[in-house]
């Protein structure tokens, strides 16, 4: 009795957990495609709702671990997508022909310009002392230069950097500040936050920077020694702004002004907050996918799946009577469980993923048929309904378990060796089969044991009926 209560409680908790994943506002998605409109928390892939796919290649410096570079690139790009509001974007590694590339999939957008600006920019921010400004149609040459080592990195003391708005305007800058006890740099690592806003002092937009404690001390030291001189704020080897220092700045804040649009200001803020890319990215491919084709296909697939599901449910009731009703309840339970887990985990639902869901319907029904045929055999030899149910489940447990585990292993292989939409199929297959195994072995058993008195053993008994301890 105690075990049965535990199973009831566990079954209810799992169902409530899945249901909460479907009804709680976990995301801001608005799915308006067929029945998916009732599951707004499920993230849809590019092949369903359309979007942009961008893929980038890169060169790894000799002696540097490729895996570490890939992980760093993915981490930085993931932060950039989140900070830019593309929270549903997928950033992943793609390996082809022994070459690693990074793929970024952004559902629901059609304009690639901003995405390319965010992804393709290296995001390297630093401050430098301006020594002179020259005009030239080509890159000026540094006649005398030297390097200095800071934190194990060799840095050129001087360089020419072009203006972001005027390609013929060049700043000769000193990349290292030589004030205080030791030379130092002020980089994006010293910035804790960057916020885009309207310029309250004049036209245009600004990006407000907040420094860390160490960054504040560096910036205060630099500005104290450069009063009436210019400091350049450089992003991706372009001078964004080079203001004149009027006084020592000790508040730990700086401002990038002169930005023409809010979008540009937001992009700069995102790049600064997200950190530097360890390598330069080169665009390998770009695809823009419209949502119309995906929606039409999804609607067709879902409608076909619903029709097939109804036919299967009717079939189960006709051939298995009350056990068929239990099978249908288990099927609905598994559907909610699968959708709930997809919502909670944030997994991306793709067209192959929908095919995986439909496949799990068959897995759930197939498992129930195996169990019910075994129960019918137990009823035929005269076992009472409740005993027949218990014997039936006990005897097919290993069969159901082994069959589902085999399918799950195949799904795991697909998940780890593939990418994109095929991985989406693997995800829904694994979740669906796990749900099918749970509903077959726990939910269906609980319901059948609780309602075994609805079974009609006389429909299955043939010949001599065997009772406990003798014959009749």
UniProtKB/Swiss-Prot annotation:
Stored InterPro entries: SecD, SecD/SecF_arch_bac, SecD/SecF_bac, SecD_1st, SecD_SecF_C, SecD_SecF_C_bact, SecDF_P1_head
SUPFAM superfamilies per record: Multidrug efflux transporter AcrB transmembrane domain
Positions of transmembrane segments: 8-28, 300-320, 325-347, 353-375, 396-416, 424-444
Membrane topology recorded in Swiss-Prot or TrEMBL: Multi-pass membrane protein
Keyword RNA-binding: no
Gene3D superfamilies: 3.30.1360.200, 3.30.70.3400, Multidrug efflux transporter AcrB transmembrane domain
Gene Ontology biological process terms in this record: intracellular protein transmembrane transport; protein targeting; protein transport by the Sec complex
Subcellular location field: Cell inner membrane
Tagged with keyword Calcium: no
UniProt entry keywords in alphabetical sequence: Cell inner membrane, Cell membrane, Membrane, Protein transport, Translocation, Transmembrane, Transmembrane helix, Transport
Complexes and interactors: Forms a complex with SecF. Part of the essential Sec protein translocation apparatus which comprises SecA, SecYEG and auxiliary proteins SecDF. Other proteins may also be involved.
Family in the record: Belongs to the SecD/SecF family. SecD subfamily.
Main function: Part of the Sec protein translocase complex. Interacts with the SecYEG preprotein conducting channel. SecDF uses the proton motive force (PMF) to complete protein translocation after the ATP-dependent function of SecA.
Protein name from the UniProt record: Protein translocase subunit SecD
Organism: Petrotoga mobilis (strain DSM 10674 / SJ95)
Lineage: Bacteria, Thermotogati, Thermotogota, Thermotogae, Petrotogales
């Amino acid at each position: 009795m105690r075990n049965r209560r535990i199973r009831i409680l566990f079954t209810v908790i799992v169902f409530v957990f899945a249901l909460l994943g479907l009804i709680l506002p976990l995301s801001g998605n608005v799915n308006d495609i067929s029945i998916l409109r009732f599951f707004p928390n499920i993230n849809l892939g590019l092949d369903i709702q359309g979007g942009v796919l961008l893929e980038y290649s890169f060169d790894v410096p000799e002696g540097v671990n490729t895996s570490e570079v890939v992980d760093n690139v993915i981490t930085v790009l993931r932060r950039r997508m989140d900070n830019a509001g593309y929270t549903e974007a997928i950033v992943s590694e793609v390996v082809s022909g022994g070459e690693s590339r990074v793929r970024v999939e952004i559902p629901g957008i059609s304009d690639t310009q901003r995405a390319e600006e965010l992804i393709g920019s290296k995001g390297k921010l630093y401050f430098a002392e301006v020594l002179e400004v020259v005009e030239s149609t080509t890159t000026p040459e540094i006649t005398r230069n030297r390097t200095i080592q800071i934190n194990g990195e060799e840095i050129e003391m001087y360089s020419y950097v072009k203006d972001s708005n005027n390609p013929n305007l060049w700043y000769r800058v000193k990349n290292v500040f030589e004030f205080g006890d030791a030379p130092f740099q002020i980089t994006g690592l010293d910035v804790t936050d960057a916020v885009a806003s309207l310029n309250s002092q004049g036209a245009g937009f600004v990006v407000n920077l907040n420094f860390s404690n160490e960054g504040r001390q560096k910036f205060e030291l630099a500005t104290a020694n450069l009063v009436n001189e210019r400091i350049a704020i450089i992003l991706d080897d372009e001078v964004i702004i080079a203001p004149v220092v009027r006084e020592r700045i000790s508040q730990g804040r700086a401002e990038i002004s002169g930005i023409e649009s809010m979008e540009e200001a937001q992009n700069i803020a995102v790049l600064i907050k997200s950190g530097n890319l360890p390598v330069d990215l080169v665009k390998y491919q770009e695809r823009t996918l419209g949502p119309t084709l995906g929606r039409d296909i999804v609607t067709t697939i879902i409608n076909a799946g619903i029709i097939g599901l109804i036919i299967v449910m009717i079939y189960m009731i006709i051939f298995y009577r009350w056990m068929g009703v239990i099978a249908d309840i288990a099927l609905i339970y598994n559907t909610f469980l699968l959708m709930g887990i997809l919502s909670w985990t944030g997994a991306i639902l793709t067209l192959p993923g929908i095919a995986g869901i439909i496949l799990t319907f068959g897995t759930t029904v197939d498992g129930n048929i195996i169990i019910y045929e075994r129960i019918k055999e137990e009823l035929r030899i005269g076992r009472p309904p409740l005993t027949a149910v218990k014997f039936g489940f006990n005897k097919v447990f290993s069969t159901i378990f082994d069959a589902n585990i085999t399918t799950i292993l195949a799904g795991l292989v697909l998940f780890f060796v593939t990418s994109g939409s095929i991985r989406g199929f693997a995800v829904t297959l694994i979740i669906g089969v796990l749900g099918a195994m749970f509903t077959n072995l726990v939910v269906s058993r609980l319901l059948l044991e609780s309602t075994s008195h609805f079974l009609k053993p006389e429909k299955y008994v043939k010949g001599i009926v065997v009772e406990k301890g003798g014959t009749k």
